[in-house]
């Protein structure tokens, strides 16, 4: 079963990070668990050797790049999946077009790392967007950072502030 979350209910899935995703013109995320070959989904999700795919759609490639750039660990080598990708052992993160995608496993094992990489490549191939770098990124990281910062400030929702107490 594919679960879909939108801006209105994203906090139900990623409570602490929802605001950050929304600030990058988040539209929706589709979440799907896959059981390992020969395995069955158990209570509370797939068996421990399964895969989970999260495909976050944003309003533009620049916004998808923005959230990906926040997740990107520069110490990890790039992978040739989508526009850019990396693996932290438990997940492969990539962005392509308007999508930031995370493919994850529940155990860090060499055979799962290869399966995860193959699965992520298949997911990337299914994204019809050609995945060209946004012009803001091609102009340089400084320009992209300025545009992303402006977009993030524009999208952030003000938090309610308690009225000051007047004691006298």
Kindly label every feature range from the protein language model.
Residues 1-168:
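Soluble, non-membrane globular domain cores that form compact, hydrophobic packing
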């Amino acid at each position: 079963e594919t679960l879909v979350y939108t801006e209105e209910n994203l906090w139900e899935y990623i409570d602490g990070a929802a605001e950050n995703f929304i600030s990058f013109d988040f539209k929706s995320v589709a979440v799907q668990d896959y059981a390992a070959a020969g395995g069955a989904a158990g209570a509370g999700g797939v068996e421990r050797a399964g895969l989970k795919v999260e495909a976050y759609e944003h309003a533009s490639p620049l916004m998808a790049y923005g959230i990906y750039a926040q997740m990107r660990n520069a110490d990890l080598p790039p992978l040739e999946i989508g526009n850019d990708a990396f693996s932290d052992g438990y997940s492969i993160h990539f962005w392509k077009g308007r999508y930031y995608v995370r493919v994850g496993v529940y155990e860090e094992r060499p055979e799962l790392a290869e399966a995860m990489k193959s699965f992520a490549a298949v997911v990337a191939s299914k994204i019809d967007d050609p995945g060209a770098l946004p012009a803001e990124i091609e102009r340089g990281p400084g320009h992209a950072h300025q545009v992303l910062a402006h977009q993030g400030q524009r999208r952030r929702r003000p938090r309610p502030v308690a009225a000051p107490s007047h004691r006298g």
